[in-house]
Amino acid sequence: MLACLVMAALAETAYGSRSARVGLRNGALLVVAAVVVMSPWAARNAWALGGPVWTTTHGGYTLALANNDAYYDDVLNRPEGAVWTGPGQFAWFDRVNCELAGVDEIEADRRLRNEALRTMEKRPRDAVRAAVARLSRFWSLAPDAAVYARSVRVVVAVWTTPIWLALVLGLLDSRTRQAPRAVAAGMIVGLTIVHMFYWTDVRMRAPIVPAIALLAASARRGHMHRAQWVRTS
């Protein structure tokens, strides 16, 4: 969620007010408010784990889960939408669990993050391919075919399609470059960028569903206002 916070603050700074000074102030206030809210969690982690972790110690794991040799080899050369499972995944889990046995959470997070970054540096082309595949999965109309029945996927796609169309219309509306819509758009962009690199599936969209709903609803409202203007002009 830090990426959402950063993008939201930047959007508020850039588009929150016609005055650059007011926009900068509002963006700073947004950051300060977030720090105040998250401080108890960071303090708890500092006491329990020995370090002021502001979000989670799971980040290194999810980055490594999406960027390792076994994943690249097993998924990237299979048909689109392939789900990572089987011997390669099990072997990776076993290796990681053995190597990190007895290691504290913060150190394990650091090691896995560094391992993932080394893999991406070693295989940049595959890293880009994997990022594009995750982007597609993050914004997929329906969940993975390998996991869910066709009937479930059809129902989800029928529900999601009009929302996505409304979201696109909302993003194209010129008023989206104003607060609070710009902040919502910033949050969407922030989480999308994160999950191009970290492990993802459709449920990872959950934190930005309110932002998606706001922009999708604004498209309908904008259409109604334009229609009313045409009738009265």
Language-model-detected regions and their locations in the chain:
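Alpha-helical transmembrane segments of integral membrane proteins
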Residues: 3-4, 21, 25-33, 125, ...
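Membrane-proximal stem/loop segments at transmembrane-domain junctions that anchor or position
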Residues: 53-133
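Membrane-interface anchor segments at the N-terminal boundary of transmembrane helices
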Residues: 111-114, 118-184, 194
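A juxtamembrane structural motif centered on a specific transmembrane helix
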Residues: 177, 216-233
